[in-house]
Amino acid sequence: MIEVVAGIDAGGTKLAVRVETLDGTRLCDKEFPAEDWSASPVDTAATWLRERLDRAVPAGYRMLAAGIGAQGCDTQKHCAELETALAEQGLRAVVVNDAALLVPAAGLTEGIGVISGTGAIGVGANADGDPLFAGGWGWVIGDEAGSAGIVRLATVAALTAHDEGNPDDGLLSSLLRAFDVDGPEALARKVNDEATAENWGPHAPAVFTAVEDGSALAGEVVGAAADHLAALVRRLVTRGAVGKDVVAAGSVITGQPRFEAAFRARIGTAFPHLTVTLLEDLPVAGGVALARRHTGNA
């Protein structure tokens, strides 16, 4: 049987699987729904991953190793436990946090990866190779550079301005249209009654639309989100993260040029030695790279 390696990107909404032969021939890129993905308990997570990987690998090929980026694996211990659980199911794997796929996906061996998508997290490594994490707390208490966190910040800003008697500068009305409600009180209920990323995140474009339409308040929200993402990089650098590159991915930073520019400006000012790069390939490419390194076929 022909040996292959795989990359897996297990995020909050979808699972991406890429399978390649050892000579680099790509056999498939597949996606599966991942709303029910959880990194804990590890035995259940391993079964969940193995079942979907088996469905992705074409018949007649043998899986040599997989590189897995798993949302929710936020410590080295957790990653190691999931690796062990996968090994017990016959899968040789290296497991990292999903944000840690970005640097290898960009063809680099060191650097800082930041995700600004549904949530927001930064991942790096120190000179000894130990992983470092910043952010990724979730949209209820953090992740202000993610789509759900941006909507939370914007809603608070718009409702606060309304309570203070300030006229709507466009942010409140943009949110009302996005959530299809007729007033501030209804907006508060709509946001609170379903405090999920699925309810909040898709409305982030309304904040950026308000910025384009001239809302200063929306501009402040976007600036605060860029500050948050830059702060994740600062925390990692302060703790010894190595590398000269910051690799960014996620729907917000890749889909909103104004936000990308704000983030670049902040990194350029605070860390002129760092270069910000938007990931051009899918993050799952980093899983393939990790699998190749794991087997000595890099």
Which functions belong to the PLM regions below?
Residues 13, 71-73, 118-121:
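Short glycine-rich anion-binding loops that position phosphate/pyrophosphate groups of nucleotides
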Residues 31-37, 99-100, 118-120, 137-140:
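Short, acidic/turn-prone active-site loops that include or flank metal/cofactor-
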